[in-house]
């Protein structure tokens, strides 16, 4: 974000240097000194992140939101690809439940945002969403991408597989709330069902990530003088 805004980094990242030197190909300190998105992407050369970001750069589409979406795509596709390789059958199934639900919910939200706020074309929507479906069918994705209004999109969501998970009732407080409720539920259920497996660690990390997101949101609201309800 500092690079995108051409701002100098004020954070001292030296405390993370040893960890990144051991576990990563990235030079975190050098990256923190970059003053543009282009510099950041070039600084990632040799890492797994470079190729998808370099493609955006070549297309002239290397904006901060586009880069964030590309990283989300890489994350989910990588997890989905390696889960069967490194995990037992039971653990892979558990991970599929958690990440599959998370991907479905994100695709619902991204499609709604694309239709409601940006009026993106069908092709642009396909490029935006995660190309993996769990309980959502390709036909449902296509119907939402081709929908003429938001009511049609919401209709598909409410009548999807997640209907049996009461998504319509949860959507009374917004799709974002429904997505969080359903995803939280899956992570909680898998950890309780398999208390001596990787499901517990997976659930722990998920809820820690949620806590961090809430802390960041709170800090940003304080920083920009926003109220708690904003």
PLM features: what roles do these ranges have?
Residues 1-230:
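Extended alpha-helical surfaces
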